[in-house]
Design a protein with these regions (language model features):
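Soluble extramembrane regions of membrane proteins in the secretory/endomembrane system
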Residues: 1-176
Length: 176
């Protein structure tokens, strides 16, 4: 698309099936489903996808989803948010061809971390463990908890950058 503009986009709400399975396996209290709104994670998420080409899903109903079609073409991007607007995943596919040489600036993940709604002062730097889903030359990670009291959940935040620009950030609860 000219000037980096998206040619196609899609957005929708989807159920977080992995989260629902984890909650169902771990909490058998009778009021569980009524208390989900109070828990730090949501069983529902919003995704937004954009692409420099038409998004064509491979699934039977033809609906674009968070994972269909794959986010694998330069210029494609995806954002996943909670119903409250907190960032859970950011993904931006970098160019397929190298454009000049470094050195590249250190990536600044602070803006993305702020958008997660997590308490940044409670996150501790950690060694990255996850592979970035897109090409990257720098990675970072943090550990902490999300929520309070009995509902507190240990989390990891993993991030990656390409040539100084963030290309991936994911808030990863233990069931991921």
């Amino acid at each position: 698309a000219p000037d980096g503009m998206a040619m196609d986009e899609a957005y929708s709400f989807e159920w977080d099936v992995a989260y629902l399975a984890a909650v169902d396996a771990g909490d058998r209290s009778p009021d569980l489903w009524h208390r989900l709104a109070e828990k730090p994670f949501s069983p529902l998420y919003f995704f937004y996808r954009q692409s420099p080409r038409k998004l064509i899903a491979a699934n039977r109903d033809g609906m674009v989803r968070a994972d269909d079609p794959p986010v694998d073409m330069s210029g494609m991007a995806e954002v996943v948010l909670t119903p409250r607007g907190q960032l859970r995943t950011f993904l931006s596919v970098p160019p397929q061809r190298e454009t000049g040489g470094g050195p590249w600036p250190e990536p600044d993940f602070r803006a993305l971390l702020r958008e997660t709604g997590l308490d940044g002062s409670a996150l501790r730097p950690a060694a990255p463990q996850w592979a970035s889903p897109v090409d990257s030359d720098r990675k970072a990670a943090w550990e902490g908890t999300h929520g309070t009291g009995d509902d507190a959940v240990p989390i990891r935040v993993e991030a990656a950058a390409y040539h100084g620009r963030p290309v991936w950030l994911a808030v990863l609860p233990p069931w991921m």
